[in-house]
């Protein structure tokens, strides 16, 4: 089973002591820390499909206006390419996935190179950069950094993800 516990931590208290149950959380001082990379995906998924799903998720999470979704998508595509991905063939020589830091770097490069007005450049850098940077700081930043839990482990073992100690971003 996979239980994602957003509030009270009750499942962790009831089931967390069993030998075959792994509890992952946000505070590494209290339990094993959850580590995920939203830019990684399993074999059999095309990188462009994954990028499109990421853009859908970001659109649902953050208010996006004007060209922001297109700018973010371009930054994500460039981040994959800078990690060695061929987006057309959906192959990588290195099997390395980008991180939020990679996307932020590519976002700034892309906006600087673009034909947008200086006001628009500032708006896009400010709006998208701030949102992405919020995912690289504090506990959330720790979750999205480092070696992520393997999909096989996450989806085929008994896992409780305790998010009760983190607020919304």
What is each PLM-predicted segment?
Residues 2-169:
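P-loop NTPase motor domains
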């Amino acid at each position: 089973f996979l239980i994602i516990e957003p509030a009270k931590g009750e499942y962790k208290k009831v089931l967390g002591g069993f030998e075959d149950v792994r509890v992952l959380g946000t505070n590494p001082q209290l339990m094993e820390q959850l580590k995920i990379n939203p830019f990684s995906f399993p074999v059999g998924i095309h990188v462009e499909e994954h990028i499109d799903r990421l853009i859908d998720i970001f659109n649902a999470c953050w208010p996006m206006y004007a060209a922001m979704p297109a700018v973010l998508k371009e930054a994500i595509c460039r981040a994959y390419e800078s990690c060695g991905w061929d987006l057309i063939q959906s192959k990588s020589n290195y099997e390395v996935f980008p991180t939020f830091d990679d996307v932020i770097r590519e976002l700034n490069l892309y906006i600087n190179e673009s034909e947008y007005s200086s006001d628009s450049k500032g708006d896009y850098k400010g709006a998208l950069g701030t949102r992405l940077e919020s995912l690289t700081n504090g506990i959330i930043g720790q979750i999205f950094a480092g070696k992520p839990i393997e999909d096989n482990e996450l989806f085929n073992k008994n896992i409780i993800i305790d998010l009760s100690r983190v607020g919304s971003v």
